[in-house]
Amino acid sequence: MEPREVKDRILENISLSVKKLQSYFAACEDETPAIRNHDKVLQRLCEHLDHALLYGLQDLSSGYWVLVVHFTRREAIRQIEVLQHVATNLGRSRAWLYLALNENSLESYLRLFQENLGLLQKYYVRNALVCSHDHLTLFLTLVSGLEFIRFDLDLDAPYLDLAPYMPDYYKPQYLLDFEDRLPSSVHGSDSLSLNSFNSVTSTNLEWDDSAIAPSSEDGDLTDTISGPRSTASDLTSSKTSTKSPTQRHNPFNEEQAETASSDTTPVHTTSQEKEEAQAPDQPDACTELEVIRVTKKKKIGKKKKTKLDEDASPLHPTSSQQKCGQQGEGDGLVGTPGLARDPSDTVLASPQEQGEGLSSTAGSSELSELSQMGLLIPEMKDTSMECLGQPLSKVIDKLHGQLDPSTWCSHADPPEQSFRAGSPGEAPEKPPFCDFSEGLPAPMDFYRFTVESPSTVAPGGGHHDPPGPSQPLHVPGSPAAALQEEEEGGRGEGQTSQPVEDRQGEEIQEPEPQEPDSQLPLVSQEPLVSQEPVPEPVSQPEPGTHEALCKLKRDQPSPCLSSAEDSGVEEGQGSPSEMTHPSEFRVDNNHLLLLMIHVFRENEEQLFKMIRMSTGHMEGNLQLLYVLLTDCYVYLLRKGATEKPYLVEEAVSYNELDYVSVGLDQQTVKLVCTNRRKQFLLDTADVALAELFLASLKSAMIKGCREPPYPSILTDATMEKLALAKFVAQESKCEASAVTVHFYGLVHWEDPMEEALGPVPCQCSPAEGTITKEGMLHYKASTSYLGKEHWKACFVVLSNGILYQYPDRTDVIPLLSVNMGGEQCGGCRRSNTTDRPHAFQVILADRPCLELSADSEAEMADWMQHLCQAVSKGVIPQGIAPSPCIPCCLVITEDRLFTCHEDCQTSFFRSLGTARLADITAISTELGKEYCVLEFSQDSPQLLQPWVIYLSCTSELDRFLTALSSGWKAIYQVDLPHKAIHEASIKQKFEDALSLIHSAWQRSDSLCRGRASRDPWC
């Protein structure tokens, strides 16, 4: 979606929210109660106002608080800064929004925005909503409609750090919602006129609600005053749900979305409730209630839903008795609106389920009583949001740990409890006919989005299922196989798994049997319950030093940077045991908002996984790549410019995928589109990562928009094997048919030819006192209250990798000193947000950027070049400079070891180095590290320097050591000698080279370089 369309959609949503509020207040005049935090009408308004102010911010983590403090009076700033439950600037931004609504001053603040566009450009990108004159003018006009709306909002709310509104599970149970507090006159026959703007057309606009984030509202029809509801669209959605496992709208199947507005039948729940309460015996009321087609929505998963209701109903005896009593008296809904909205009430079965054998000629009183129960159960909610994707409120529920497994089997809280806890087995405010696989996913890490619930049982899955045609033999055939082996290891083959109705949070809908080629190829068993990747099974070595060493290595965590470090989230905030792989990237709310704004193509598109991979490894041109899996697309992301932090290199629709090809030893994965027009080769360099990606991809397609049959997964790698055998045969001077490859992997290889030239002096350590660059520059000293910048002259010196800023050339004490090569600095970039030309920023980790300005473009370019060189050189540690490490392929045959580059287009191999296995005398490793040193015999005709090989993780190193030891033992009939690295200087050199490999990988996408606590996308 184009930025202009996004901004138009945001303003359209604000308009709908303001109109709804105005309709209430216009009808009630002076009797209208004030809007409070827990009211649903506030939820959508604040969500869209917050989106408008966040859209285009340069630093989302700080929110718009850094801007609005320039316009806000001091006592209000102090009032917000001392809030005890608001800890972040993003939360303070929303507290300021609440304060502006309370004071009816939001329009005045926006006028200040309009008068200070220069100040806005410092904090927003150029295409931000508030930086567009037309959009800001319309925004101001819409907000002026809130002038006479009364708000009574509490600013000190802990959820403001995560969301602009109160999550459903946080709402007090004993407080009435805004619609329930309205005077009784509003609930009369004029309800249609009050909501006349909310016609079928406007409802269709509202489901396509937000281009930034899924709507947090379950539907306007949940309210006491209701808009029309489309029965035809309900039937369409029920038909769709029998084909798709998730009842998710498929944007690629346009046939399902065509429903004429003339086919819809509006049914207003308010008029039904009032007529039934006033005259329950009238035939008209019964006739109107009979038209409600609840049974057609209930046919999905009917039998299992009944069982769940029977099991769950004893958990709520109080609410059930109260409800039965009310139904017997014939009054109910209007008298107790709070009970009618309690999600615990939805566990009662519908009349069609309880009385299937009832005659159609039953008495009118009995039918009225049953029909009233039918009204209570479905709550007549607008399910369009549920068919499209999870609302943002469900994401907030997950982040707060509301779906913790410890609460799944707990009893419901007593009615007098002040805060609502999620009832077991369903999400808050979720209608009983929704897909429970969306409502209760697995417990997840902090800000982590997953697809598969670890307790979900696939149809027909088991320990002894044969693998499908697209599965490796060592991959289990059931999504729950790994967890069952961990938790139910003693269960026999004949025993059945836990019943579906006893498992809270499992799919209630009966899934269709899938074709054999649609079975999900899952990761190996260990990654589901352990953070450590596990290599594929190979032959066990003889007992000895190598086996013990490998066992110890498996216990060590991978030294790769964890995803928590990538996202700026501390490792302690998530459970490491639930991490499937260190390369999985945890997405927090700020990242998710950025992805929704800049990447996602569909409204309500859901993020499944974000995985860190690479491209070009086998060719020696390693580049970082992020693979983003949603329910519609596979996005391949690269580093972007400053205003757009990342670039969408490709967006591949699941419907475009023809097949997936796995490379040799699962080191690469190739996505091939229909007609083979587009192909994308992704590097994994890790068996466990390849299996994780394949499992995630297949899960995303099954739960997303792709309909069966699913793309085949080819694991034979026939063409790659033939090309590699041909290359090895040429190098070994033998026939291709005689070649046997025991190992193929993507590694970093320290070229011994570079080492043979002698130690290279570290170029990052110039002689003491050497001046790299110095000169007079201007720096931004301060910014006035109205945004006017104040620049001062300074003398800047870059010496020994440290940047010094002095007030004048003659001064001795610097104003500031920055170590360009350490964690203190994150690089430099041009500055487009200042008033001065030729300005650039030095990015600092612990303080705002240092903004400098040169006199000319050439001088600025020279300074930036020197600063970038100082940063890149500073990454290389002091001391012995490590030799360049070449990304390449490593091949082990029966008698030789090869390093080579492979052209992925032509499958042409270029040899980098060759060694005979018989010439290897020993191998040296360090415990818990993924590198090794191969030592060669000095008596061999080919004199070789030691080879240093760096692999992606310890599991890949174990796989390499196993293959190497087996080949060496086949020659000498004894185990290959293993040694430990003891010399401190050599050990430090290898550590430095390893850190250089990792930092070079991160620098390619500007990640984690000196700013672990900052937003990695900035």
From Swiss-Prot:
UniProt feature, compositional bias: Basic residues: 294-306
Top-level lineage group: Eukaryota
Chief location bin: cytoplasm
Keyword Kinase annotated: no
Membrane-protein topology: Peripheral membrane protein
Region (Disordered) location: 210-367, 407-440, 452-520, 526-545, 555-583
One GO term (biological process): late endosome to lysosome transport
Keywords: Acetylation, Cytoplasm, Lysosome, Membrane, Phosphoprotein
Positions of post-translational N-acetylmethionine modification: 1
Entry function: Plays a role in lysosomes movement and localization at the cell periphery acting as an effector of ARL8B. Required for ARL8B to exert its effects on lysosome location, recruits kinesin-1 to lysosomes and hence direct their movement toward microtubule plus ends. Binding to ARL8B provides a link from lysosomal membranes to plus-end-directed motility. Critical factor involved in NK cell-mediated cytotoxicity. Drives the polarization of cytolytic granules and microtubule-organizing centers (MTOCs) toward the immune synapse between effector NK lymphocytes and target cells.
Name this polypeptide is given: Pleckstrin homology domain-containing family M member 2
Organism: Mus musculus
